[in-house]
Amino acid sequence: MTTTTIQFNALLLDIEGTITSISFVKDELFPYAFENVGNYLEEHYDNPATQIIVEDLRHIADQQAENDVAVVRIREPRKECIEDVTKNVRHWIKRDKKLTPMKALQGLIWEEAYQRGDVKGHVYPDVLPVLKIVENRKIPIYIYSSGSVHAQKLLFANSIEGDMTKILYGYFDTNIGLKGESNSYTKISERIKIPPSEILFLTDVEAEAAAAKKAGLQTKLVVRPGNAGLTQEAINAYGTIESLEEIL
């Protein structure tokens, strides 16, 4: 835990394990997408957005089928295409692959889930009060997650705390780069026009904290129930917090 006041002019937040419980993502969102991917494709196959995703997934499948026997090449006919995409997406979900078009498809599936009221986005109780204080200090708040920007917005628009999107300035996903690569954080700094040293990044993942720190950002590791354990080396290098209140 940290007791010193942290000075920052932008707040960059991971989602899963940081402001949202890992169990919500792992035990609710991912299984929902896993179970409903085929049904969604059946209902929305001819939608232009769906077709773009399918084509992107076809290219990825062609590449990965060379080295992964569980990945099938996606056939052209509608019925076979849906079968193949469903099989691949379920395989990638099991492997926790960070594939941008798959994340986009998951986002579309979750959009329906939120609209139907099947799910509500979980946030820890300390999150919204702290973000309101940060916003009142005129400090912009950004989200950076491997989930698509679309999925991020859905979660915060349909959270158990209500619509939180009004206090969030922007969102980043794997289109800006992978979270374990320092260049991604450099790009975010350039995009929001705030020097890296003035950005505070909160995450529960050591590799992400390392990448952000390498890019010059301030970092803290967030400790939440159910999160993976942290090495003593990481705790010493980045420090930990157990509540967002500790950044105030």
UniProtKB/Swiss-Prot annotation:
Function (record text): Bifunctional enzyme that catalyzes the enolization of 2,3-diketo-5-methylthiopentyl-1-phosphate (DK-MTP-1-P) into the intermediate 2-hydroxy-3-keto-5-methylthiopentenyl-1-phosphate (HK-MTPenyl-1-P), which is then dephosphorylated to form the acireductone 1,2-dihydroxy-3-keto-5-methylthiopentene (DHK-MTPene).
Top EC category: hydrolase
Gene Ontology terms: biological process: L-methionine salvage from methylthioadenosine
Lineage: Eukaryota, Metazoa, Ecdysozoa, Nematoda, Chromadorea
The protein's required cofactors: Mg(2+)
UniProt catalytic activity: 5-methylsulfanyl-2,3-dioxopentyl phosphate + H2O = 1,2-dihydroxy-5-(methylsulfanyl)pent-1-en-3-one + phosphate
Pathway involvement of the protein, from the record: Amino-acid biosynthesis; L-methionine biosynthesis via salvage pathway; L-methionine from S-methyl-5-thio-alpha-D-ribose 1-phosphate: step 3/6; Amino-acid biosynthesis; L-methionine biosynthesis via salvage pathway; L-methionine from S-methyl-5-thio-alpha-D-ribose 1-phosphate: step 4/6
UniProt entry tagged with the keyword Nucleus: yes
Protein name per UniProt: Enolase-phosphatase E1
EC number(s) from the headed UniProt entry: 3.1.3.77
Gene Ontology CC terms, in alphabetical order: cytoplasm; nucleus
